[in-house]
């Protein structure tokens, strides 16, 4: 099959983030502290919830006849691809699988290779299930929505560099081709113009995992979208509490859909097994996930999609990168980068990674 050209626009704020990421890793020899405070599974799950609630409010604000058009002769509302929650879920699951497979191949700089080998070793990170389960149970008593609307405080975005390095705008001018160069990466180069490829390809595995790390503060912004009919200061979306006014004005079916998606998980609670090392999406965060979007056009160009399906997929990717851009300060704190000497990985003193 002939490879086709696929275009995926990256917002300017994320292009600058890619340049900064390259600068921190290759010029200042810093590494992203692992496991990330907000890992990729958490980001993807947060996006699905954000997507579902945004779509619900958008549909509720439009006149009924605009979103209840019958599909063909069936009495089923037509849902555009960009509003389809099931497609959104499939998209994030595809991102998870693709990230886990491609990270060691094309998403790491050479300086990060040693860190990757250590963090994916089975004895470096140990999953602690019991304490996390107890914590989650106590949180569930508050209802899923309260956990999302009142998350724990994310990493500080105010930490400043203590070195005398040039300011960000200057280094961005010095490295204007960061995004473009990532798209044409070649193996084992040590500068900002390339991402490395490993010499061997690991067997693809459909890893499944979960975590109890906190979500960023993005859901605090959703409180502003509570319908005017609501008089509750602490929204609760669980069906068990009858008479909750949070989604007064919504159809009962839509309220149930939102309740369902707020409790939705990307992967089962019992994965990965405790005797296996966690997959990359369990450990890495937004910094490395963003690099995947530089590579996606090339990856998609080699896959067999119909034009209709590809168009729908690209629309969902576009919405997702806009989401990353909107909550850029939450997902990309400067404090995520630390000196290599501060990154301690010891098989004698393994670090704990929470599991649900």
Curated annotation (Swiss-Prot):
Q: Does the keyword Translocase apply?
A: no
Q: What PROSITE patterns does the database record attribute to this sequence?
A: MRG (PS51640)
Q: What keywords appear on the UniProt entry?
A: Chromatin regulator, Nucleus, Transcription, Transcription regulation
UniProt domain MRG: residue ranges: 2-350
| Record function comment | Probable non-catalytic component of the MSL histone acetyltransferase complex, a multiprotein complex that mediates the majority of histone H4 acetylation at 'Lys-16' (H4K16ac), an epigenetic mark that prevents chromatin compaction.
Q: Which GO terms describe its biological process?
A: chromatin organization; regulation of DNA-templated transcription
Provide the residue span(s) of the region labelled Disordered. Answer: 135-210, 225-247
The record ties this protein, via Pfam families, to: MRG (PF05712)
Localization, UniProt: Nucleus
Q: Name one GO cellular component term.
A: NuA4 histone acetyltransferase complex
Q: Write down the superkingdom of origin.
A: Eukaryota
Q: What is its main location?
A: nucleus
Q: Where is the composition biased (Polar residues)?
A: 178-189, 229-243
Q: What is the lineage of its organism?
A: Eukaryota, Metazoa, Chordata, Craniata, Vertebrata
Q: Where is the composition biased (Low complexity)?
A: 142-156
- Protein name (database record): MSL complex subunit 3B
């Amino acid at each position: 099959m002939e490879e086709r050209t696929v275009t995926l626009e990256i917002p300017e704020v994320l292009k600058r983030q890619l340049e900064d990421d390259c600068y921190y890793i290759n010029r200042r020899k810093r590494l992203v502290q692992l496991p990330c405070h907000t890992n990729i599974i958490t980001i993807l799950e947060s996006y699905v919830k954000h997507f579902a609630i945004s779509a619900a409010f958008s549909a509720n604000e439009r006149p009924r006849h605009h979103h209840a058009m019958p599909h063909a002769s069936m009495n089923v509302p037509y849902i555009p691809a960009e509003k389809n929650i099931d497609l959104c879920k499939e998209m994030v699951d595809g991102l998870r699988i693709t990230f886990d497979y491609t990270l060691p191949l094309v998403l790491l700089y050479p300086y990060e290779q040693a860190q990757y080998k250590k963090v994916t070793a089975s004895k470096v990170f140990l999953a602690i299930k019991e304490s996390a389960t107890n914590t989650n149970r106590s949180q569930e008593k508050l209802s899923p929505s309260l956990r999302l609307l009142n998350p724990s405080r994310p990493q500080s975005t105010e930490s400043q560099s203590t070195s005398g390095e040039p300011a960000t705008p200057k280094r961005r001018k010095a490295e204007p081709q960061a995004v473009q160069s990532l798209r044409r990466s070649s193996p084992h180069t040590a500068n900002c113009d390339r991402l490395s490829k490993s010499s061997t390809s690991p067997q693809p595995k459909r890893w499944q995992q979960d975590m109890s790390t906190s979500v960023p503060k993005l859901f605090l912004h959703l409180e502003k979208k509570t319908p005017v009919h609501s008089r509750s200061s602490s929204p609760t979306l669980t069906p068990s509490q009858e008479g909750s006014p949070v989604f007064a004005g919504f159809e009962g079916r839509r309220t149930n859909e939102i309740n369902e998606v707020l409790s939705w998980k990307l992967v089962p609670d019992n994965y990965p097994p405790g005797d296996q090392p966690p997959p990359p999406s369990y450990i890495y965060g937004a910094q490395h996930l963003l690099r995947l979007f530089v590579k996606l056009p090339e990856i998609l160009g080699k896959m067999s999609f119909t034009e209709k399906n590809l168009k729908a997929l690209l629309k969902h990717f576009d919405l997702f990168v806009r989401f990353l851009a909107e909550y850029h300060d939450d997902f990309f704190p400067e404090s995520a980068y630390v000196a290599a000497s501060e990154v301690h990985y010891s098989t004698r003193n393994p670090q704990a990674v929470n599991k649900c």
